[in-house]
Amino acid sequence: MVSPDLIRNMVGIVGNIISFGLFLSPVPTFYRIIKNKDVQDFKADPYLATLLNCMLWVFYGLPIVHPNSILVVTINGIGLVIEAVYLTIFFLFSDKKNKKKMGVVLATEALFMAAVVLGVLLGAHTHQRRSLIVGILCVIFGTIMYSSPLTIMSQVVKTKSVEYMPLLLSVVSFLNGLCWTSYALIRLDIFITIPNGLGVLFALMQLILYAIYYRTIPKKQDKNLELPTVAPVAKDTSIVTPVSKDDDVDGGNASHVTINITIEL
């Protein structure tokens, strides 16, 4: 009989693979930034939030906090490195204002993590208490990260278009949340279950919206609009032209002559 721990590890490995794919999903965005040498209208906020989320989960999965969670450490450790690379690229091609903002946020996150690590290690002396404190923080920040697609979903409902909600990303997000929720339920880890369970719910909502609106993507309006045609109308216009006294018009003297012109409109 297959042991629950073996099944849990297998599910965790699959979860690592799927999560790795999710971490790599912004690569085209950063390729564009490097190519243009400008961050344009892209924001660093999602990557700063994900960086903090990864740091918390790495700390949570360490044996000194929550034993037997090495797979949580591996994928979030990889995610931490990837997010650091993204933020380095973003920093290099940002203006001074964005660089200053990023510096402040990164410093705040570093101080926050230092406070959490010191507070937990010095103030909590059992795995249960340490898991509780760090786990609650992971749930809070993980929920914020997973709820970010709500903005996109509201846009889909308003515009009735799934143009800015890629199907592949929604499917992978659903599978990722489902995988890690299953992993957490095998040995009931409520702190992994809650944010990933919400991730499954939000991804499922995206898939439902896609099924509803994928046929109703609004077509772009044709710039070459056909103007309404007007039938030509004949109109007589009289023009009065002065005539010199020396000129003879029909054998008589005249100071003006009237010319009829027909204009087609």
Swiss-Prot record:
This protein's encoding gene: SWEET7B
Keyword annotations: Cell membrane, Membrane, Repeat, Sugar transport, Transmembrane, Transmembrane helix, Transport
Boundaries of every MtN3/slv domain copy: 10-97, 133-215
GO molecular function, one term: sugar transmembrane transporter activity
GO cellular component: membrane; plasma membrane
Entry function: Mediates both low-affinity uptake and efflux of sugar across the plasma membrane.
Membership in a protein family: Belongs to the SWEET sugar transporter family.
Membrane topology, from the record: Multi-pass membrane protein
Gene Ontology terms: biological process: carbohydrate transport
InterPro entries: SWEET, SWEET_rpt
Subunit structure: Forms homooligomers and/or heterooligomers.
Protein name, as recorded: Bidirectional sugar transporter SWEET7b
Localization per record: Cell membrane
Native source species: Oryza sativa subsp. japonica (Rice)
Ranges in the topological domain labelled Cytoplasmic: 31-45, 91-101, 153-165, 211-265
Transmembrane regions listed in the UniProt entry: 10-30, 46-66, 70-90, 102-122, 132-152, 166-186, 190-210
Gene3D superfamilies: 1.20.1280.290
Pfam entry (one): MtN3_slv
Chief location of this protein within or outside the cell: membrane
Record topology, Extracellular segments: 1-9, 67-69, 123-131, 187-189
